[in-house]
């Protein structure tokens, strides 16, 4: 079970996360409260011992081109409905995880997954909402694709989520925060619980 802890904002948070998680993410060019400037993102990406996704709602290749150039990231996490041509250009540059909001029937989401065909698939409730979604839909999609599951995951529900949905990975942010900051004890315990639930 792979674990991604998203939304690190400082070297201190990165240190707490990279000890335990397989991946992390820095939010750039977004309205998220976890958004950092591109120079900060570059420092975090360059300092990390684990792969770091640049996470953004940027919706054009031109915007992403700036992100890639200024952060030197090798992994992108797209939270927008980019034009397909732009998305294909981005995929040619870096490894891309595309977020798909879980609302409506699984077939509707599957059609979007087939259209974009990203390197990695993230099933989410919405940008940083901290709420779970209908896991029945995610389960149906996980039976067809390798997916990362996100949205409202925490210490209390991550085992249940993994047992039910059977994703290849989980993605957490607010679920391992205390007072708005990544907490090492919460990160460690989240990862332990996730990895003890072998797929």
From Swiss-Prot:
InterPro entries: Aldolase_TIM, PRAI_dom, RibuloseP-bd_barrel, TrpF_fam
Chain coiled-coil ranges: none
EC number of this enzyme: 5.3.1.24
Family annotation (CDD domains): PRAI (cd00405)
Pathway note: Amino-acid biosynthesis; L-tryptophan biosynthesis; L-tryptophan from chorismate: step 3/5
Alphabetized UniProt keyword annotations: Amino-acid biosynthesis, Aromatic amino acid biosynthesis, Isomerase, Tryptophan biosynthesis
HAMAP family: PRAI (MF_00135)
Family label: Belongs to the TrpF family.
Protein name: N-(5'-phosphoribosyl)anthranilate isomerase
Taxonomic path: Archaea, Methanobacteriati, Methanobacteriota, Archaeoglobi, Archaeoglobales
């Amino acid at each position: 079970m792979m674990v991604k802890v998203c939304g690190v904002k400082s070297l201190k948070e990165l240190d707490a996360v990279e000890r335990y998680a397989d991946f992390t993410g820095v939010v750039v060019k977004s309205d998220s409260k976890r958004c950092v400037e591109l120079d900060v993102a570059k420092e975090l990406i360059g300092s990390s011992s684990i792969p770091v996704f640049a996470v953004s709602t940027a919706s054009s290749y031109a915007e992403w081109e700036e992100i890639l150039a200024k952060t030197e990231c090798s992994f992108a996490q797209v939270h927008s409905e980019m034009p397909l041509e732009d998305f294909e250009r981005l995929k040619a540059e870096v490894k891309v995880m595309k977020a798909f909001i879980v609302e409506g029937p699984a077939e509707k989401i599957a059609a979007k997954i087939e259209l974009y065909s990203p390197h990695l698939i993230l099933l989410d409730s919405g940008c940083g909402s901290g709420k779970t979604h209908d896991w029945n839909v995610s389960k149906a999609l996980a039976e067809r694709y390798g997916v990362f599951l996100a949205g409202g995951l925490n210490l209390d529900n991550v085992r249940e989520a993994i047992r039910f949905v059977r994703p290849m990975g989980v993605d957490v942010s607010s679920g391992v925060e205390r007072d708005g900051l990544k907490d090492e004890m919460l990160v460690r315990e989240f990862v332990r619980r996730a990895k003890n639930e072998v797929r």
